[in-house]
């Protein structure tokens, strides 16, 4: 009986750490990949300078596209572990919204990354034609529309749904809950003000993951603070 309790306690501590590590990994990889993509494919890229710019930034795009799938895998792990560790505290409605919006966010990020990759590959085959007929401009516009309009709003929905669960379960301090709501609303309604605002999401995941890691490392104090995964046992 004692050994079972010890094993259960270890599992409760190990799983939050896994979520924290996955969240930190996602935040770092996604942050870097988005910066590389935006610098390599800026919104105002057009005209005769586009060819030279694309040629000199092919490596940056390739590196970003390599990191995006791994960032997605880390985010899937983060979602799965957090949802599993909600346990009996899980609200089926908000958990379903959280998981669905997270999957849609990843799908749209992958689609935007695939379009960026298609631009680079096609440019290597027929550079002049792509510049002349506007394919590069069109593809870049689709990529930024998917990323800045749809993916970012799904990220906002993810934040709101998870934050609502935290509010109900008191899993995190109240100030953090209110800050999360404010940032989520900002992503939902004000994304057109700055195309760099998508970086709010990985920064938020990073802060959350650091908090989870900090609490989990405190051992028995984790349950005393109402940490995610505490089922009141």
How would you name each of these model-derived features?
Residues 2-233:
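Hydrophobic, aromatic-enriched alpha-helical segments typical of multi-pass transmembrane helices
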């Amino acid at each position: 009986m004692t050994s079972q309790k010890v094993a259960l306690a270890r599992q409760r501590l190990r799983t939050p750490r896994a979520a924290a590590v996955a969240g930190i990994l996602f935040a770092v990889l996604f942050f870097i990949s988005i910066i590389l993509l935006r610098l390599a494919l800026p919104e105002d890229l057009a005209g005769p300078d586009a060819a030279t710019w694309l040629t000199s930034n092919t490596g940056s795009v390739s590196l970003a596209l390599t990191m995006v799938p791994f960032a997605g895998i880390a985010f899937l792990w983060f979602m799965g572990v957090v949802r599993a560790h909600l346990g009996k505290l899980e609200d089926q409605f908000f958990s379903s919204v959280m998981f669905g919006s997270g999957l849609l966010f990843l799908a749209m990020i992958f689609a935007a990354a695939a379009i960026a990759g298609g631009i680079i590959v096609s440019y290597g085959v027929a550079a002049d034609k792509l510049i002349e007929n506007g394919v590069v401009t069109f593809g870049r516009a689709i990529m930024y529309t998917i990323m800045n309009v749809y993916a970012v709003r799904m990220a906002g929905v993810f934040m709101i749904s998870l934050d609502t669960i935290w509010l109900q379960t008191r899993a995190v301090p109240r100030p953090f809950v209110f800050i999360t709501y404010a940032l989520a609303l900002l992503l939902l309604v004000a994304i057109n003000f700055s195309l760099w605002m998508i970086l709010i999401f990985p920064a938020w995941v990073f802060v959350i993951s650091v908090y989870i890691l900090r609490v989990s490392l405190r051992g028995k104090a984790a349950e005393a603070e109402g940490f995610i995964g505490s089922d009141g046992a």
